[in-house]
Amino acid sequence: MFLLDFQMELERIVLLSHLAPVYDDLFDKRNTPKERIVLLLREPSTQPDNDEELMFLMFYRPLFQKMNKKRSFLSCFLKLTDAQENSKKQLIANTSKEEIRKITEEKGGCSALLLFSLLDAELKNEKALYQLGACCQYMDDIFDWHDDSIANRKTIANGLNIAELKSFYSQALVETIDAFDKEF
């Protein structure tokens, strides 16, 4: 039984891994309205309007079918969709550093919760997992620093000098580790 459960979880992870870049393209390259993406998530039988939607649904439909916790999965995906929509503010010049931090935490935190929803395990410390996702998004922003700077996308990474970034990221890691330590 354990091996079968593991196999199903692995299949879901692989499907989401294929789905994620297509999902990003719906936002970033296609400028698909959030309402349309929500429709695709809520109603997987929706007919696609273009090749990106077709590819999205090719991965999403079997993933959704394989989900044991469909309601939790959909809830996480809808929260991530809100966070993705909110991240468009990163292209607005007067968006505050605090708002950028909040956007980054939401994207990363919701992504981590979505990934965990693929597993059949019970989540015992949502806050710690959310913080871990935020740290992962901070790292992603560090790796994407050059591309984000060229695109005029405001991130924590391109809004701080190196010393400030080290301090910020170190503090975020300590807070995340502390959140997990409280669980055990």
How would you describe each model-predicted region?
Residues 1-13, 17-19, 25-26, 46-149:
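All-alpha helical catalytic cores of prenyl diphosphate-utilizing isoprenoid enzymes
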Residues 23-33:
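Amphipathic alpha-helical interaction segments
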Residues 35-62, 95-106, 150-182:
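Divalent-cation-assisted or electrostatically stabilized phosphate/pyrophosphate-binding catalytic cores
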Residues 11-18, 31-42:
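Amphipathic alpha-helical scaffolding segments
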Residues 1, 181-184:
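Short, intrinsically disordered, charge-balanced linker/junction segments flanking boundaries
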